[in-house]
């Protein structure tokens, strides 16, 4: 009998991506064949609810899956399932909800009638073998204790909790042994990491990063999103001590560059405090690139407040910006705030912010010409630099992707694409 065919569809954030990869590897370990959705007997959809648009994409993905001629079952998991599963269950009796992502593989067995007393957890090495990733996400934290007025994720993900230190180190070592050139530490609120050591001591994010440097040989580590108020001098100094092994990159979800807007959002810092944090980063990590999330059109955002936000982004000089139009989420405080911004105003502000983002990305890339950076060769001649810019390598002779190498940045084209050459013994190759 042929093994049932399964497809895993991921929607949403980097944390979801890491969780979907693990679900895929769990299913492969059980002998299921992973295929494209149109060929599947069962489709797993890891859902996202961060915005109204994300929820709409989830419903569309489920309807699309149900429409395939093979009439597959659809197992849904993730944030939408944790908030209001009935919206998906009412679409068909072929839709099955599984709130616990670690139990998805077992639920798949149940739906398809495959005997399994329990589903063993897979290792990160098996994830790499199954998915062929050039970098591996290591989830070290989940949940959020903040209550930002626009956000519904804390309801979907629950309170903050952290993976124990020894478990994180084991995952990193497995990735290293599998030949992964870079791991990315991920979490819903990464800077709130508060794991327990083997001796039951509390360990914060900077101490965890130091432990990874001292107790593993992983070639390269990247930190994903860290809230601005969680950026500490201690964390930055750890990053500065290991410039060859820690990517000089931080993603800071500033959300707005206007203090009045930040206050209505329930963000625990001012625009001035954010810029103080940026100055501290620049002082300790002068070559670091900074990316951000920014929301336009939050309730009550005036033209003047938007201009303040745009001006801050220009002053900081972000290398990458994720620009979101405010999305009204039922059950949040912001949904009932007065002075909701008209859609056409949001659209224009989004256009201007995205235009600025493109200009800033190119400017940051161009200031790096002549610098040497660590980079991951992903495939072909495609590189991801330590600064998280995408680049093309001029010569891949003798290289097998994925791999880590030093490159010299030699140019940037008008689209912002970086061009690089291999660095040998501290000088450009002739």
Task: Tell what function each PLM region has.
Residues 1-194, 201-204, 250, 272-283, ...:
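Proteins enriched for Cys/Gly/acidic motifs involved in redox and nucleic-acid/cofactor modification
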Residues 10, 187, 225, 254-256, ...:
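Active-site proximal loops enriched in glycine and acidic residues that flank catalytic Cys/His/Asp
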Residues 67-69, 240-244, 317:
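Short, conserved loop/helix-junction motifs that constitute active-site signature segments
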Residues 74-75, 83, 177-303:
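Conserved SAM/AdoMet-binding glycine-rich loop
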Residues 131-134, 144-146, 256, 288, ...:
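Short flexible coil/turn linkers enriched for glycine and charged/polar residues
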Residues 252, 293, 313, 321, ...:
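Hydrophobic, well-ordered secondary-structure elements that form the walls
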Residues 301, 317-318:
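Contiguous mid-protein beta-loop-alpha structural module that forms a pocket-lining wall or clamp
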Residues 336-430:
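Terminal RNA-binding accessory module
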